[in-house]
Amino acid sequence: MPLFFGRKRENRADSCEDPVLTALLGSRTVTREMALQVPTVAGGIDLIANLVAGTPIRLYKDTPGAKATEVTNDYRLRLLNDETGDTLNANEFWKAMVRDYYLGKGGYAYINRQGGKVVALHYVEERRITVLKGTDPIFKDFDLAVDGYRYKPYDFLKVLRNTTDGAAGVPLTCESANLIETAYAAQVFEKNMVRRGGNKKGFLKSEKRLDKDSLNELRRGFARLYSADGEGSDNFVLLNNGIDFKESSNTSVELQLNENKLTNAGEFAKLFHVSPDCISGKASEQDVASIARLAAIPLMTTIQCALNKDLLLEREKGQFYFAFDTKELLRGDMKTRFAAYKTALDANFMQIDEVRYAEDMEPLGLDWIRLGLQDVLYNPKTHELFTPNTGTSQQMGQLSLIHI
């Protein structure tokens, strides 16, 4: 097997924000700061980050042939749900990880171990992370460097978007650079219109050649006119005889500005797999439920896989697993839930105490199952039929009745 980390084989991962690469390609770099200036991007990321950060993480023990049992006294649960051992609490930690997941090469957190026990999770800005990749495309391996200090992959919790090597993901600023740049340019265009006070752009037509002093005076006058600070008696331009102002019309662009912003908002909503109404705060119950199923839970699954890989001991893998408690996200509204419970109770595949448990209520200790006298019960193992209304039973295929 080839050596991956010999000094001559050590390569850095190419980044879409590499200034040399950008210069060679001749394209403008879309930064995370530009992306966050677009309200739909900032709102979409914040919406999903709040869902992830507000959903508790549980630890379960999987027992073959039985229901998985929840482990409540594990020390790692406190790090994931409350205090990380760093300056960030768990809520701030997961929000930062989700932002880096969408706008950087991934969310990274250093796993502080002492004697094999995880004592803290330290969030590290993704821009401080350098990926040192091997060159073998089959037996992939890599190291991570932070400010020149080198670490192994198992030293970090990694939450990566659309990764192909397990080391770095693909941010929205690379994958959807054109859409973000278009929306950002619209913001800049609108800002410039406001700064000009609504004054149109145009050009001057002169019947005779102007001297240098006249040109400078015109420049200063129009600078005051288009300046947001110009007001009162300074906010005008005096045109001498023979000079006309011709407006360069961009009315069609201005009229379509709001329409384009709505269109772009819809495109961004597709990137986050949510409805545009969710981001604008006008979501229906169905829209809210779709956020959990289509946007938050897939990201939670990515995080769960990372936790199971990097936080579990080797002897625990296959027996224990971390999972988000998504019950609250998927419960729906009260009317829908209670209608579903009624159907389950009428069909006898749920009991009263099971419904109360699902609603976080104290059980009543009722172990019986409600049956109707009109029912006929059949045991598929013994082929026995029992009729509660008459209190009789018989074997399938036999005509004689056995009275109980």
What are these regions (language model features)?
Residues V253, D287-V288:
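Short beta-alpha connecting loops at secondary-structure transitions
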Residues N235-L238, D277-Q286, N308-G318:
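Short acidic alpha-helical/loop segments enriched in Asp/Glu that coordinate divalent cations
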Residues A289-A295:
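Small-residue-rich helix-loop
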Residues A283-E285, F320-E328, A358-E362:
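Small/polar glycine-rich anion-binding or flexible loop at a beta-alpha turn
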Residues N199-F203, R337-A340, Q351:
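A general alpha-helix detector
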Residues M1-L257, L262, E267, L271-V274, ...:
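Structured, contiguous alpha/beta core segments that scaffold functional sites
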Residues T87-E92, A96-G106, V131-K133, L257, ...:
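Divalent metal-cofactor coordination and adjacent catalytic microenvironments
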